Every structure is written in structure tokens, then in C-alpha cells.
Amino acid sequence: MKLVEDTDSKILDTKKVSDKEAEEAFKTILTWMGEDPSREGLLETPKRVVKAFKEYFGGYTEDAEKILEKTFGDVEGYDDMVVEKNISVSSHCEHHMAPIVGTAHVAYIPNERVVGLSKLARVVEVFSKRLQTQERLTMQVAQALMTSLDAKGVAVTIDAAHQCMTMRGIKKENATTVTNYFLGEFKKDLSVQNRYLRFISK
């Protein structure tokens, strides 16, 4: 299985550019916008934006594989799908850096071992907190789970609104995008895939 090319398995060195340098860059952007970064209301804005960006894009310093390292084998033979629905997604598109807001559904079929339920949501969060396309985000979550858990199958669905479509450009406020990615049994067996789709539609 070819993994999605990107920073999906790399931890970036965020210290190559200092916070101070990033703050100066935001001051330049404020000036370009026609603002005065020295006025009272904006004095702390560059520092606040840098702090916010560390939260928005914290996924560049996190490793999904490490999150999934701890698994549990005492599942008494459970071999059916595990589905976690309605995981909040907050990301930013890589084209306009506009917010992507929506919901993810994740399922996997364990191969003797399971992972803590919160870890599924954390993997979604790690890849969401990077500049993304929704298609790549969906694939990265699925591939990380499939590889790290050695699962029999993985399914990921994301339903999200892109503010690059709702607030600018075509400005279609009610438009949402749905992406699905299936691996293993979910891809090979349509009955398994359809069962998953029924689960998440309830």
C-alpha cells in the first residue's frame, strides 16, 4: 500500500523559524492589509496569532504512529468492526488557509488487538492540525490506522464545510464535502462497506 506523500510520517522542526521572526511576518501582513500594527488594538496581535497557529497546526509536531503504539489484546475474541462516529474535525485548507470544519467517522476491524477509543479521535486531530486537502486527510487517517494496528480493514468518512467555498470565491454557504476511504475488508467486501455506511447514517 502506497502511503500518501506528505508530512504524514515526519515530525517537522518548527525551531527553524523563531517565534519572533513569525511575529514580524504577521506585522508585515497587517501593514500589507492597510492596518497599523503599532496601534493599541494590534500591539499584541502578532504574538497572539503565532500562539494560535501553534494550536491550529500542532499536528506537524505529533506522530500518529506513537499515539497508536499501545494496543490491547484482551478482547475475548472480538473481531467485528469498531466504529467511532461524530468526531469533530477542525483543519485548514492548504490553498487559502481557510478553516475546514466538520465531522469524521472512523471504523476498523481488529486483527486480535484493539486500541483505546480516544486514540481514534487523536489520530484524526493530528492529521487535521496541518494544512490539508480533505481527500488527503481522509486517506492519511485511514492509512495510519491500517498500518499501525495491522487491522483487517479500515473505513474513514469526513463530512465538512470549507470556508474557502462558503466565505469567498463561489460563496455557497450550505455546501459541504463528503470523502470516504476504504482499506482491507471495507474495500474488498461491499456488504461490510454498506454495513459501515448504515452505521454512520443512523
From Swiss-Prot:
It holds the Pfam family GTP_cyclohydroI. One of its GO terms (biological process) is tetrahydrobiopterin biosynthetic process. Toroid-shaped homodecamer, composed of two pentamers of five dimers. InterPro entries: GTP-CH-I_C/QueF (IPR043133), GTP-CH-I_N (IPR043134), GTP_CycHdrlase_I (IPR001474), GTP_CycHdrlase_I_CS (IPR018234), GTP_CycHdrlase_I_dom (IPR020602). This is GTP cyclohydrolase 1. Keywords: GTP-binding, Hydrolase, Metal-binding, Nucleotide-binding, One-carbon metabolism, Zinc. Pathway: Cofactor biosynthesis; 7,8-dihydroneopterin triphosphate biosynthesis; 7,8-dihydroneopterin triphosphate from GTP: step 1/1. Zn(2+) binds at residues 93, 96, 164. One of its GO terms (molecular function) is GTP binding. It catalyses: GTP + H2O = 7,8-dihydroneopterin 3'-triphosphate + formate + H(+). The gene is folE. Its EC number is 3.5.4.16. GO terms for cellular component: cytoplasm. Disulfide bonds: none annotated. The keyword Metal-binding applies. Belongs to the GTP cyclohydrolase I family. It is an enzyme of class 3 (hydrolase).
